[in-house]
């Protein structure tokens, strides 16, 4: 027996609202990490980003800076499987034509860590060998991961003395007693004559 008109209309409405899933409905995004370095010149950033865009990639994160006469770039790019395959081939071609040394590696999104809290570290001191090594050793020996590092040297504004600065983001496990960690960190900085701040990360 056919359904009454009202019920038939209701079935058609539900069918229209129901999502239609296919294998091509939502392609899974993949990630690739890219590093590139080459002699500094105008257009390096354009050359690399053009290849990424032309292949359909999306730049999620990047770090770029001049190091002496070299220019270095780090990128995290997302895209579907076809984008990744095409991009790897185009990066090989770019290496041959641009003078850049390029390496790439497939990767995955880092899962959120609920057992760690981000802290920032700011250090300024007279330039001296071994500062970054000492800081890295301090945190490593306590099971604390380093999420980000940026350093630079510069001349002090009034005296012209060579200065060194460090900015770090460290991931402190929740099991670590932060007050004790800060005290130990300040003891190290006092011993090395470093001006330093350790404080919670502010997004």
Listing of model-derived features with the role each one plays in the protein:
Residues 11-27:
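Short, Lys/Arg-enriched N-terminal segments with co-localized hydrophobic residues
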Residues 27-203:
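A conserved regulatory-domain signal marking ACT and ACT-like small-molecule sensing domains
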């Amino acid at each position: 027996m056919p359904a009454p008109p009202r019920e038939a209309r209701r079935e058609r409405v539900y069918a229209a609202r129901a999502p239609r899933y296919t294998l091509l409905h939502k392609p899974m995004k993949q990630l690739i990490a890219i590093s590139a370095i080459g002699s500094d010149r105008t257009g390096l950033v354009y050359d690399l980003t053009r290849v990424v865009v032309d292949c359909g990639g999306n730049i999620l994160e990047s770090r770029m800076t001049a190091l002496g006469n070299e220019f270095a770039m780090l990128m995290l790019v997302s895209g579907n499987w076809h984008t990744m395959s095409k991009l790897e081939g185009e990066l090989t071609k770019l290496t041959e034509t641009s003078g850049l040394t390029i390496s790439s590696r497939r990767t995955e999104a880092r899962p959120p860590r609920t057992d760690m809290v981000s802290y920032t570290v700011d250090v300024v001191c007279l330039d001296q060998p071994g500062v970054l090594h000492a800081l890295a050793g301090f945190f490593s020996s306590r099971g604390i991961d380093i999420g980000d590092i940026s350093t630079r040297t510069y001349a002090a504004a009034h005296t012209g003395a060579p200065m060194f600065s460090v900015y770090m983001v460290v991931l402190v496990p929740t099991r670590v007693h932060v007050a004790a960690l800060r005290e130990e960190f300040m003891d190290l900085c006092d011993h090395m004559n470093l001006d330093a701040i350790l404080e919670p990360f502010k997004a």
